[in-house]
Amino acid sequence: DIQMTQSTSSLSASLGDRVTISCRASQDISNYLNWYQQKPDGTVKLLIYYTSRLHSGVPSRFSGSGSGTDYSLTISNLEQEDIATYFCQQGYMLPRTFGGGTKLEIKR
């Protein structure tokens, strides 16, 4: 199986900040990389697919980039509603494995 690693398990930022979350695959996944958002209430939403394509209804402050084994999700101008845990997932090969998640919190 392809292993997905999110080296940062939690991240603190202030509202209005630009935040970048990284993800690394154990092999080249040819841009088949998705990002999901899990809210504190458990609601899960697809944000980005195929590295950089925004899912319908997702605000443009979210963006994705990367290639090969290294990928990132960037949130520009962080808003309160963005507080959540973010997971990367590779869609290159079955099983479609996930990273361990990065929990985004407000800096106090």
Curated annotation (Swiss-Prot):
InterPro entries: Ig-like_dom (IPR007110), Ig-like_dom_sf (IPR036179), Ig-like_fold (IPR013783), Ig_sub (IPR003599), Ig_V-set (IPR013106), IgV_Light_Chain (IPR050150)
Spans annotated as Framework-2: 35-49
Keywords: Adaptive immunity, Disulfide bond, Immunity, Immunoglobulin
Segments for region (Complementarity-determining-2): 50-56
Region (Complementarity-determining-1): 24-34
Keyword hit for Disulfide bond: yes
Misc: Anti-arsonate hybridoma protein.
Protein name: Ig kappa chain V-V region HP 123E6
Source organism (scientific name): Mus musculus (Mouse)
Classification lineage: Eukaryota, Metazoa, Chordata, Craniata, Vertebrata
